[in-house]
């Protein structure tokens, strides 16, 4: 399969109910990159106890305007948890911004956090600490093993859906009610 137009890039992966890995149980992960070399995603619904204000203080960024609740912080995945990735929908005027899909933008440069601290950043954002990574062929095998559902992403689901509703809402986008799926298959 050619990965140039990967069907998984910019999709949401919804963990199936039987997912036992605590990093991904009931998770929804936005696939930022997918190629023959592997995949990278950001988990959207794993809130952390650290606030954006704490992150800004740790980075010695002076806060002039306290960040609103519309700037949420999550554990983006188990890889490089000290790295930050900002998903947002505002213009790409920051140093390291990549347009994704449905008006979403990914920024990895410090200047977006500095802009948020002075009230000039995007209106809302999801700050992801770390990311989810898959080696070549690993994600494809997990899909074959029925570990994930794939569903289209939307800006609203990524940035606005309450964390506790994200898993069910993402599955519902393709008509799946997760409460009706068994965690184990029976064998006769």
Swiss-Prot record:
UniProt cross-references to NCBIfam families, sorted A to Z: PRK00228.1-1
Record protein name field: UPF0301 protein ABO_0112
Family to which the UniProt record says this protein belongs: Belongs to the UPF0301 (AlgH) family.
InterPro entries registered for this protein in UniProt: AlgH-like
Annotated GO CC locations: cytosol
Species assigned in the record: Alcanivorax borkumensis (strain ATCC 700651 / DSM 11573 / NCIMB 13689 / SK2)
Pfam families: DUF179
